[in-house]
């Protein structure tokens, strides 16, 4: 069961424009130098009251006429115990606001998620609704704070929909 580390309702850092950034608990990667080590423990953070959470999210996603993106960070949003929550949130938001861009940060590699999605319908569905995926573990020796949406140069910014259409990993930068 997913647990919430924090929510930033008006985040101008994690996505294009303004996004609602959802930081989930639990990360198996434990990258040295991680800026979010408090999210590693899957039992940390707060339990999520899903009906209340989704009501707030629906209200906030286009509050004051600002069309926000939806960003999932962590922790690790694509770890097994976070998949159901991420899938439910994306599915509901895309049903109401289909043009909402979805960003996901993962410490794993995109191609590994594609392989796992062959036998995991929830992960496959998440990827089918995701616009941009930032992949790869944070590597402290490759730290570069000038990079778009990334903390280290080994990480990639992937156009998920173009990648699924072409069968090749399509990087945006």
Feature roles, as predicted:
Residues 7, 30, 50-52:
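N-terminal, charge-rich interaction modules
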Residues 85-94, 143-173:
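P-loop/Walker A phosphate-binding loop and immediately adjacent motor/lid segment at beta-alpha junctions
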């Amino acid at each position: 069961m997913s647990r919430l580390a924090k929510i930033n309702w008006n985040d101008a850092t994690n996505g294009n424009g303004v996004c609602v950034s959802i930081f989930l608990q639990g990360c198996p990667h434990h990258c040295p130098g991680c800026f979010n080590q408090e999210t590693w423990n899957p039992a940390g953070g707060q339990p999520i009251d899903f009906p209340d959470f989704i009501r707030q999210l629906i209200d906030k996603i286009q509050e004051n006429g600002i069309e926000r993106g939806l960003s999932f960070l962590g922790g690790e949003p694509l770890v097994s115990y976070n998949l159901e929550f991420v899938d439910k949130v994306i599915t509901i938001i895309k049903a109401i606001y289909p043009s909402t861009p979805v960003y996901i940060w993962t410490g794993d590699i995109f191609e590994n998620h594609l392989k796992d999605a062959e036998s995991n319908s929830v992960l496959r569905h998440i990827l089918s609704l995701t616009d941009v995926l930032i992949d790869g573990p944070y590597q402290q020796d490759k730290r570069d704070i000038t990079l778009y949406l990334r903390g280290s140069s080994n990480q990639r910014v992937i156009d998920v929909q173009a990648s699924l259409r072409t069968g090749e990993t399509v990087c945006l930068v």
